[in-house]
Amino acid sequence: MLFRSAALKSIARDSVIVSTKQKVAQGADFRSAADVVAGLDESLKIMGTDYVDIFFLHTVLPNAYEHVRSQIVPALLREKEKGKFRFLGITEMPPKDARHEMLQHANKDACWDVIMLAFHMLGQNARQKVFPATRARNIGTMIMFAVRSLFSTPGRLQQDIKVLAGEGKLPSWLAEKAQPLDFLLCEGGAQSIIEAAYRYARHEPGTNVVLFGTGNPAHVEPNIAAILKPPLPRADIQKLAELFGHLEGVGLDEPNLGANRA
């Protein structure tokens, strides 16, 4: 955070998009609107800026949404009027909300400008459950879990596919392959599974921004290069939908912080 503050002071503030976030619960207890507003103020103070572009209410579970909408949002909209942030956002908690239940409620309310959600090659259900509403209402989307441990940890993809095949959720022949997604690594396709994962998420209709984080600076340039590449071949996208479009809750665990992730 101190590095971010110094960085912001060295450039024109309107040349970058800055976001921050606050959780709405502490354990089983919901936070008050005053507490969340105080968190916003503290973030502004630490960053040395008088506003952020996006303020997110973070990891909101379905059972917290009504509290957020009725108690916290009105207070935050007053802070927005004061110029403390430009756009109001909300993020889901994928490990505990694989069906995007919270966001399906949020997409019915007019207060949200941006949402953050999970979407990846083996977790495609946002295509039906979230993106139609965000596209219709022009709500911005930030994609997380595009890579995470599922695609970045050696052997993890193969392990999960074997488990899913054993449960009857995937064909057994897929579990027998050394690289189950080898069809993506072809001429005109991707050079790596991580590259394919970023390109897949980036070019999904309804995606606006793909997030990535890493503990290794060497990952940054390849990640950006992957995101900037063209879509995967149409046949590959169709095959991913045929093989994995029915899956839910796969690859939504927290990552190894040293790994390449999003």
Task: Place the predicted regions along the sequence by residue.
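Active-site phosphate/pyrophosphate- and oxyanion-stabilizing loops and adjacent acidic/basic residues
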Residues: 5-6, 41, 104, 199
